[in-house]
């Protein structure tokens, strides 16, 4: 699980049936306090939280847990956006996003 920033949309001419109606995004891991990039962007499915480009989100990056969030055990998914982050508190520092 990591905090990331939605940096783009992903489009496909064909989708697996379990992904119909779901939005796909590129999410780059970030340090939640400094907002500095912490890795390469990955594709993640919006788990119904209403994320969009520029959103700071919480990503479940483990296939079985991601499929559980989507309630579809056969979905070909590794990462799902499970929350939009409002704020992070770490080491006495509070970072607000909303």
Language model features by range: what are they?
Residues 18-27:
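Short aromatic-glycine-enriched beta-strand elements
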Residues 16, 46-50, 72-73:
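Short, surface-exposed secondary-structure edge patches
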Residues 35-43:
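Short, structured beta-strand/loop micro-motifs enriched in basic residues and often containing a Trp
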Residues 43-48, 60:
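Histidine- and aromatic-rich ligand-binding microenvironments
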Residues 1-13, 83-85:
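Structural detector for short beta-strands of small beta-barrel domains
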Residues 58-60, 64-98:
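C-terminal structural segments of small proteins and small subunits
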Residues 12-17, 35-36:
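Short N-terminal binding/cap micro-motifs at the start of the first secondary-structure element
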């Amino acid at each position: 699980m990591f905090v990331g920033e939605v940096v783009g949309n992903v489009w496909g001419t064909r989708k697996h049936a379990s992904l119909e109606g779901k939005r796909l995004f590129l999410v780059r891991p970030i340090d939640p306090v400094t907002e500095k990039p912490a890795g390469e962007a990955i594709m993640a499915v919006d788990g119904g939280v209403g994320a969009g480009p520029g959103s700071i989100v919480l990503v479940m990056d483990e296939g079985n847990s991601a499929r559980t969030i989507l309630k579809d055990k056969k979905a070909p998914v590794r990462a799902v956006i499970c929350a939009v982050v409002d704020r992070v508190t770490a080491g006495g520092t509070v970072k607000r996003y909303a």
